[in-house]
């Protein structure tokens, strides 16, 4: 007899490459995003969890990235 328990699974992950992110969000340039990623430990992006590395591939969690962007705006006040 199998025990089928409903476990909480995130409904969706919005992971995209840097290039895909920039194509979808034209306000951001490829170089600009890469600069943010390069400095992620200094600008708080690393703590946000928005950048995911799988081997050499760098993926961006769009939801977490935009939460981080919004927190940067709130911190500027």
Where are these regions (language model features)?
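A short, Lys/Arg-enriched interface patch at domain edges and termini
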Residues: 62-77
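Short linear motifs in intrinsically disordered/low-complexity regions
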Residues: 4-7, 40, 62
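A detector for short, charged/polar N-terminal pre-domain segments
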Residues: 1-16
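Major-groove DNA-recognition helix of helix-turn-helix-type DNA-binding domains
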Residues: 23-59
């Amino acid at each position: 007899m199998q025990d089928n328990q409903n476990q909480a699974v995130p409904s969706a992950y919005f992971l995209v490459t840097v290039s895909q992110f920039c194509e979808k969000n034209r306000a951001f340039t490829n170089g600009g995003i890469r600069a943010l990623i390069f400095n992620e430990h200094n600008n708080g992006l690393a703590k946000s969890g928005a950048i995911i590395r799988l081997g050499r591939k760098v993926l961006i969690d769009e939801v977490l990235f935009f939460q981080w962007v919004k927190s940067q705006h709130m911190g500027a006040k």
